[in-house]
Amino acid sequence: MFRLKATFFRAADLAKRYVVLALLLFCVATVGAPLHAQTSTTAEIAGSVIDPVGAAIPNARVVLTNADTRASTAITTDGQGFYRFSLLKPGNYSVSASAAGFQTATHNAIATLGSSVTANLGLSIASQQESIEVNSGAADIQTENADLETSINATQISVLPNPGNDLSAVALTSPGVVMNTTGGATFGGGNYEFFGLPSNSNVFTYDGANDNDPYFNINNTGATNLSLGLNDVQETSVVTNGYSGQYGGLAGASINYVSKSGTNTFHGNAEYWWNGRALNANNYFLSQQGAPRQFVNANQYVTSLGGPIKKDKAFFFVDYEGIRLVIPSLLSVNLPTQQFENAVISNLNSVSPTSVPFYNNLFGLWNGTPGIARAQNTLPGGGCSNVTALAGTTFGASNPCALQLQGGTSQPTNDYLIVGRYDQNIGNNDKLFVRVQHESGQQATYTDPINPAFDAQSSQPEWQTQVSETHSFGTNKVNNLVASMQWYSALFNITNP
């Protein structure tokens, strides 16, 4: 695999003109797809504020600030000195607490997807104006529940070995997962099972909205049967053994993705991968028949850019991904021998002369198969089944009815994905984001080894959109309203009708 990578950053002072978004959607129900409990698809920071002797400080002012966007939310502690910030986007935060007669204390915390971070703040008696700062990272051990959870951030995702950059492949890092290769109703292939449950028992969410395949209820894929969008993901969590009501729906794993968003600094990346015939050995079976290496060409690329529209207020992020490939399919083809064709035509001339033109056309297709000269007599009994004699000719292992050819044929497949996200801090109590995703591709659904006239393709467009508004009520209540929609189509047709 050949790979090029470039990452670029620009200073925050390059913020562009302010764009006013005249859209505020309040929605109770999801449009088109179910939503899942935000406790599993967001983060949480909670803790207590205490004085030097460990007594709770009620009504202390606690301010949470996002380190990337400087968005802040203020609440007050309850009668036991406890506070909680829920429905948070994973990221870096600072929590500061203040109260009359005490020094200000600040706790820097990293909130990961699906986690509840404890950030206790101890306030000292104010002898002079000063502040105390405490740092903490993500918890190593989950103490809130018995769920088995694996969290992977964007940096870890970027270095994870992942041919094809399949978004769903990050779940393979979790305990209890087994690649499903049994096929059947859910294809096998890139899907997986957790603790013996079927591969269609898993729930996939994107920013809290359902992202399962609408027909097979497995991971949602495009024309290449890969889940594009890995470059758009900020963090992923995989929850197993999650039988509490917040996960709902299915008993398998809950695989949750959170998308990237713009910040106060411009940031982005560009990467390119290539794989081709020069990097791959010949297939064993083709080599045995003296066939050359088949043409292979795979090009994959991603690029993204995010930043401020108005510093501390409005942000954008766009991601574009694409893959174009030609990969041969290895197939075994049984071809009639010339002796068998002659015997069939001779017999038809005697019993059904009107059928001769049809069979001549049929045999003509077989005789035009690429690589037919390499076909070998490897079928049991010469491939004759119960045919022993026809039109005076005896058939069997020494005079076969059919020869077998190991062939590799191909046609191009392509897929691309474009994502746009807009975030806005609407005062201290409201935060809004709108995300739109479009994917489109052309799949080589069937490649015929005999004649390309029988090739089939499938056009597979998809649209997803989501609007999310988070509102804080007073000092101790928060609500998140989400509307999402998913539209998918798979149109199958013959390449050469």
Kindly give the residue locations of the regions a language model identified.
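Periplasm-facing N-terminal accessory domains of Gram-negative outer-membrane beta-barrel systems
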Residues: 2-4, 8, 14-153
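A generic structural motif
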Residues: 50, 65-67, 98, 195, ...
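Short, flexible loop/turn segments at beta-strand junctions in immunoglobulin-like
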Residues: 85-87, 307, 471
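Acidic, glycine-rich flexible loop segments
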Residues: 128-130, 139-191, 196-203, 208-245, ...
